[in-house]
Structure formats: structure tokens, C-alpha cells
């Protein structure tokens, strides 16, 4: 999966859910998705 840049964790959640993942958070300016 391509790295998704982010500023805050709340912007990762919809992007991760769009990839079929349950949740996600922002770490080191990249989204980390938990599938």
C-alpha cells in the first residue's frame, strides 16, 4: 500500500477505512492503518 501522508490521526481513519481497514492513526506524518 502507498504511504498516506497526514497531519493528524483523524484524517487517517476515513482513508484507512476506504482501504478496508478497521482503524488507523498518524505516525511520523504517515498514516498507519490497522487491517
Curated annotation (Swiss-Prot):
Keyword Repeat part of the UniProt annotation: no
Keyword tags: Disulfide bond, Ion channel impairing toxin, Neurotoxin, Potassium channel impairing toxin, Secreted, Toxin, Voltage-gated potassium channel impairing toxin
GO cellular component, one term: extracellular region
Superkingdom classification of source: Eukaryota
Molecular functions (GO terms): ion channel inhibitor activity; potassium channel regulator activity; toxin activity
InterPro entries, sorted: Scorpion_toxin-like_sf (IPR036574), Scorpion_toxinS_K_inh (IPR001947)
Entry comment describing in which tissues the protein is expressed: Expressed by the venom gland.
PROSITE patterns listed in its UniProt record: SCORP_SHORT_TOXIN
Compartment list: Secreted
Disulfide bonds: 6-26, 12-31, 16-33
Family the entry assigns: Belongs to the short scorpion toxin superfamily. Potassium channel inhibitor family. Alpha-KTx 23 subfamily.
Function, in words: Selectively and irreversibly binds (K(d)=2.9 pM) and blocks Kv1.3/KCNA3 potassium channels of human T-lymphocytes. Weakly blocks Kv1.2/KCNA2 (9%).
UniProt comment concerning the protein's domains: Has the structural arrangement of an alpha-helix connected to antiparallel beta-sheets by disulfide bonds (CS-alpha/beta).
Protein name as catalogued: Potassium channel toxin alpha-KTx 23.2
Organism of derivation: Vaejovis mexicanus smithi (Mexican scorpion)
Amino acid at each position: 500500500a502507498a504511504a498516506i501522508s497526514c497531519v493528524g490521526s483523524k484524517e487517517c481513519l476515513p482513508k484507512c477505512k476506504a482501504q478496508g481497514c478497521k482503524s488507523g492513526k498518524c505516525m511520523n506524518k504517515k498514516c498507519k492503518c490497522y487491517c
